[in-house]
Regions:
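Terminal peptide-recognition signature
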Residues: 2, 52, 107
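Hydrophobic, well-structured mid-protein blocks that either form specific transmembrane helices
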Residues: 42-87
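Nudix hydrolase/Nudix homology domain
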Residues: 65-82, 90-175
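Conserved Nudix-box catalytic region and its N-terminal flanking loop in Nudix hydrolases
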Residues: 12-54, 70, 132, 170
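Conserved N-terminal beta-strand and adjoining loop/helix that marks the start
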Residues: 1-16
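Short loop segments at secondary-structure junctions
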Residues: 6-10, 21, 87-91, 108-109
Length: 175
């Protein structure tokens, strides 16, 4: 997963998030950070850089890698390795229409709003579901994406060592 930090026209620090195409088999229409499977012999960092270029047309090199957040095992059988990237220069986000319906720059300060994170329970699990309301998108983002964004907030913005693997995903994300 390419958790990419970049600027916007107003000079604010943002992260890039996509809305997946509706025709995709896995997680169609869901909100996601660019990412995908590792190619044989590929490191998570190389995969993040490749997927960022494939999904939103941003070509960065290895110097853009800031580090990793914790792996997140999903209910659908994937293990997400979040790689935090920094786009030092201005970049244009161009969604690949095969995979991405829309791509957005969301200011990092939305992660500091008082109601972030929101936690709720579901009957299928004893673990809390984590979500992050993002008003500019008109929706909430749910774990695993929300859990990873929450960890980014805690580690990068507040300097707190925070783990997120215990957060549950909503039932719709299990498939």
């Amino acid at each position: 997963m390419a958790l990419t930090l970049l600027g916007d026209e107003a000079g604010r620090a943002c992260f890039a998030i996509t809305r997946r195409q509706l025709h995709l088999g896995a997680h169609a229409g869901q909100w996601a950070i660019p990412g995908g499977r590792l190619e044989p012999g590929e490191s998570p960092e190389a995969a993040a850089l490749r997927e960022l270029a494939e999904e939103v047309g941003v070509a960065l090199d290895a110097s853009a890698v800031l580090g990793r957040l914790d792996d997140f095992a999903t209910r659908s059988g994937f293990v997400i390795t979040p790689i935090v990237l920094w786009a030092e220069r201005p970049v244009e986000l161009v969604p690949n229409p095969q995979e991405v319906a829309h791509v957005y720059r969301v200011p990092l300060d939305v992660l500091e709003e008082p109601r972030v994170p929101e936690l709720f329970s579901i009957p299928q699990s004893d673990r809390p579901v984590l979500s992050i309301p993002i008003e500019m998108l008109g929706t909430s983002i749910y774990a695993p994406t929300a859990a990873i964004l929450f960890q980014l907030r805690e580690v990068a913005l507040y300097g707190r060592a925070t783990r997120v693997a215990h957060y549950e995903q909503p039932k719709f994300a299990w498939r």
